[in-house]
Amino acid sequence: MLPCAVMGEFRGTISYATRTRRLKAGSLIRVISGIYWEGELESPAAVTELVAALTRHGYALTAVSLYQFYCSQPISLPVHVSTERRITSTKYVVAHHVKRLRTVAVRGVLTECGVDAVKHLPDKKAIALLDLAYSGRHGSAVLRRESPMRVSARVKTLVNRAAVGADSVPERILVRALREAGLECTSNFRVGVYFWDVKLRDYNIVIEVDGYFYHNAGAENKNTFVNDRWKMNDAAVRGYLVLRYPASSVFEELDTIVGQVIFATRVVREELVVVDSTRRWHRGPWEWLPLDSW
């Protein structure tokens, strides 16, 4: 390729003959239908700019490129995109044709909805993508909103294997281990005004996985310390059996944790307690504790 002082999408207007001549000379690259490029296309900065150009032209990131994006990994060439158009792939961009493209903007990048993109991935990466695309407190609701009316049996299986709603790697590891032990779980389960990392679906057991930095930064983060104690008390008086584990134990003693959770299912109470929700200890302490207590 001839050296070029600029790098990025070519947006100028040139004649067909000039474009053909530049393509042959290597000073212009056709990366995909509608997008021509000046300069190198190998560096991370160039690929990042290419992704931005693809977004501008309505191409949605998908497959392994979307997996890399969610995992905060450098996106490698060729970039994989989904489009409703039938176009030819190149060495720089692989185009996946879909009948109906459903997209969502993530950090300024146009992406195919995760539940649709997994069809282009092997199982392990597909599950990891679902974990990240539908993480957090609203993950389950987002998944329901983005799921098409009909999904393949494989996608259903992948969704069931993903730890939808979990916030962290330790939580996902624990959820999968409990499922393998026959215990179905819900992540980010609400009890009163609080959210718990894990709730066993068939038992009144809630589980919290504590990360060291979250609970020791700044004040143990004094606010977190105070909030956690009232949170535990609230669940306990409602009739839940509360279990808490440090994230380090999930990595080091996972089998022991699972064994204890299984035993807990034998002793947990079957009925919850009806509480007077007007009492202030069933509201968050941030609403009624003096500021100097935080």
Model regions: which residues?
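Surface segments flanking catalytic/ligand-binding clefts of nucleic-acid enzymes
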Residues: Y134-W294
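Short gly/ser-rich loop at a beta-strand->alpha-helix junction or flexible surface loop bordering the NTP-binding
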Residues: M1-V151, V267, V273-W294
